[in-house]
Amino acid sequence: MAWQAPQSVKPSQSSATSDPAPIADSKVNRPIADYRYPEGQTFTYGVDWRLLTAGTTVVHFDTVNGERHVVVTADSTGAVALLYHVHDKLETFFNPQSNCALQLIKHTEEGFRRVETSVRYDYHALKAVLDERNIRAKNQKHEENDIPPCVTNTVSAALYVGSQPLQQGTKFRFPSSDGGKAADIEVTVEGREKVKTPSGSYNTIRVSAEALNGPQKGKGKVWIWYSDDQKRMAVQMRLRAFWGTIVFHLAQIRSGA
């Protein structure tokens, strides 16, 4: 499931703090020994916004040439699709031993926006190399932004968190970049909870996450309920922003291509 920060704006925030110093204890750690990546599986999520069924998100997991490969598609449906068209596809590769993101590819269709984005993580140069093409505006941009020796991104971050110890009451921080300067994300392991979704009932570990710096600071908060087992499946996710709350419920799990 994509860990996409809500897009809200707070008037009190100033661009003068857009380049904060990185937080010293923010780092990406290796997965715990008994974590099980959902190889070859496809998760389908129903998406609700306020009282409406808003769309569907599908996530497929596999491994390509020794690299973890995750593909996410998100589509608005029903009345919400009439109000606001969404057809997004996000694809990432990351290292299974280190959890470091290697590449991110995004196709964005949101409202009238049509954007193609490619991000390559160059850990030798400590740069995120971004190339973006705005199809409607017919312009392109190329950026190279500083990153630490290992980062996650909007897709791999949710998997990264699930691969960690998740001891109740603890907090940890990690850097994430979708091609821009890395932001530090703080995760709080809030507790255990029984959750029922269309795919079944689960004993879960609930965590919350929010950006400590960067462009998404103060613009929303994310909660994820992970299955309390070796799989650490994201069975439910809630994103809260000024325009409301979006909830993802795990509806179906399929194995195979």
Model-derived features: positions:
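Hydrophobic, well-structured mid-protein blocks that either form specific transmembrane helices
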Residues: 115-161
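Acidic, serine/threonine-rich low-complexity disordered tracts
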Residues: 3-123, 160-257
